[in-house]
Amino acid sequence: MDWGYYAKPSKTFCQGMVNKQCSFPRGKVLGGSAVSNVMVYHRASPLDYDFWASSGNDGWSYKEVLPYFIKSERIQIDEYDHGYHGTNGPLRVNYTAPHSTVSEPFFRACEEKGLKRIDYNGKDTLGVSRVQFNINFNKRDNSAHAFLDPIIDIRSNLRVLLNAFAIKVLLKGSTAEGVEFVKDCKRYIVKARKEVILSSGSINSPQLLMVSGIGPREELNKHKIEVKNELPVGRHMKDHTMFFNLVFRSNEVAPNKTLRENLERYIKGETPLTNALGVENVAFINTKTPGKGLPDIELITSPPPLGVANKLQSILFFNFDSDVSKVFDGYNPLTDFSIYVVLLNPKSIGSVTLQSKNPIDFPVIDLNYFSDPNNEDIETMYQGVKYVLSLSKTRAFRDINATFIGHQLGCEDLKKNGSEREYWYCALRQFSTTIFHPMSTTRMGRSPKESVVDSKCLVHRTKNLRVVDAGVIPNIIRGHPNAPIYMIAEKISDEIKKYYGEL
């Protein structure tokens, strides 16, 4: 179900992980990473899309893409900004079941800091909100369930081939003619009468293009791959960085249920066991001009009893070193909750390159966090940490005795002898990891020198070949990419139908 990727070892982040490598989960399943993500439905800021359009990507302003967000959505919550949401689409959007006991105190604490309660997919982008999820009656909704399942048995022109692995796009000159793939240890070729569309995600689509001869000349030459189209494939990758070792202990205690009681609640679809991986509320803040402009930090709350990772989870899921993971032994799942800090607009640029010309070999993922020359990324995250710590001074947090207890293992000497900034910089490098949002590896744009696809997601200087996934996002958005990917797919579907005279 997961590709089992790990990012390239680093000296600037993931310092608490085995071999200083972040784990990098990607969905190896029908439906992709939407089957394994946290299901957050977030469109990001309208100005993100206006920037796409002003950068030369005609047709991608927020006004122009909003109908495609609305088209696929079926919102099932009671209070939302009307005019921004759809009610008849296949993709359900809902809240999880009842709030935890620390939910309302978090809202009130943020309000004391000047934030207002918002529909973050509506007219406001700065504020605090419950998380809108792709959930259908406490069950995950994703691209396979919402879009594919209803039509799979009734569409005569649709065939889904499972357990098949694409290894090359077949090119004749500059024209894509088909795809070569492997299934059950045998090679097959399928020819395309009209187009080949890659939707393998921000990691696998660039790998497939490069092994097919489309990519940076020096990278292809390095692996003795014939250069058929020189484009910056795999370059310009950006990802949201997350710091999650900010733990509070309060006097609000989650019910300590028996195994039988928990099983009964699970069968009935009741939280917290059917909650969205422990995520509940979000706040979007601007650390530089509070209350104004665009968000640069997202705060995510994770309440009891799923609010803190245990040692085993930290090792298996996040690849933490067994010594560093001891910090999680000191947390109590019944009383402790976490607030994650997410960097929304990073300046650091990563890449996807090849390990070899063999498409079976994993690609090389270089996240390159905290590498920007002015240290703006790590400083912004530090300001986000300070904001979270300041919540403990609010009346709302004092009322539940919410006390910060997070222990930044490996940075103790700096706490004693260094500055506060040095201490938290160390902690950020030690415990920060990915929130699994890689984008822009096959980004959209006008110039073949700076981008891979045009505004219709057609690969530059190539005929009959498109990429439609998070890789085409021109520049990282200030939010979770799942909803924008659905929007991109809806919009390009119309482009394709228009081109072939079917719309």
What spans do the regions from the language model cover?
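N-terminal redox-cofactor-binding region of secreted/periplasmic oxidoreductases
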Residues: 1-503
